[in-house]
Amino acid sequence: MQKRILVLLLCVITSLTWSQKAHRHNAMSLSEIGFMVGGSYYIGDLNQQHFRHTNIAGQLLYRYNINARLAYRLNFTYGKIEGYDSEQKGAFYQNRNLSFQSDLFEFGSGIEVTYFPFEIGNRRYKGTAYLLAELSLTRINPVANYNGALVELQPLGTEGQGTELADRGKYSRVQLGVPLALGARLSLSPNIALNIEYGIRFMFTDYLDDVGGYRYADPTLLAAANGPTSAALSNRSLDGNRYGQRGNKATRDWYTFFGIGLMIRMGGKGSCPSDFR
């Protein structure tokens, strides 16, 4: 009796072990890791022209293929954005004379849907276009050149944020966004695919550039509340105007990431499980 129980336990343990190994193999074969290198730029108060001031950007990503048409995706993106009134067309912008630059650190998670079924290394599913929809958190830190040094703008409250001069507090340097992207994938080998993507990040803030669309704060009161540097960087207009609108609050800022890179299937050579299809 004891021998039978021992044999039964050994069978159960062996079965569970093989089941776990198969599950791990399936999860690995459905997973991909990769990278993309490309560019980033922003559209907002200090730049309305696409691809102007494009900076080098990069992305690390993980993809878990739910089936041949649907995948879950995680990605970390680094980019840089900037804008200068001095390079915009129009007397208003030239006179306003504001500028900024900011590093971006973005973490995003979402769903990717392919136009055609796709699997790396499968001759039947060699290439496809896809759509990506995500939610993201992005750390921003707009800075401006002042007296030969880069000065962080958010702590200064250049529109009177955080004082009695404004009805709002200082904006957060971590912002929520909605990345939407179009891309294409092409299988190059049993375990490697080419990835091309262009995406827009719709943001829930108008302060990527530290310009929120409100009127200029009184410079004397702003200097008393937030310091002389805040007042100096709040209004850099050539004619000293402080009665007009500082920016356009009817629209919010957004930025893009586009790139090309490679995806590598984890788990080695071979087709995905039959239920993947």
For each predicted feature, which ranges?
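Short glycine/proline- and aromatic-enriched beta-strand/turn motifs that initiate or cap beta-hairpins
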Residues: 20-65, 142, 253-269
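Residues that define the transmembrane beta-barrel architecture of outer-membrane proteins
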Residues: 29, 52-56, 103-107, 127, ...
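Repeated loop/turn-to-beta-strand initiation elements of outer-membrane beta-barrel proteins
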Residues: 69-72, 119, 191-194, 269-271
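Residues on the lipid-exposed face of transmembrane beta-strands in outer-membrane beta-barrel proteins
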Residues: 35-39, 60-64, 109-113, 133-135, ...
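Gram-negative (and chloroplast) outer-membrane scaffold detector with strong preference
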Residues: 70, 75-155
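Outer-membrane beta-barrel transmembrane domain signature
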Residues: 136-253
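Extracellular loop and loop/strand-boundary signature of outer-membrane beta-barrel proteins
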Residues: 43-48, 92-100, 118, 163-170, ...
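Structural signature of outer-membrane beta-barrel domains
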Residues: 40-42, 79-83, 116, 136-142, ...
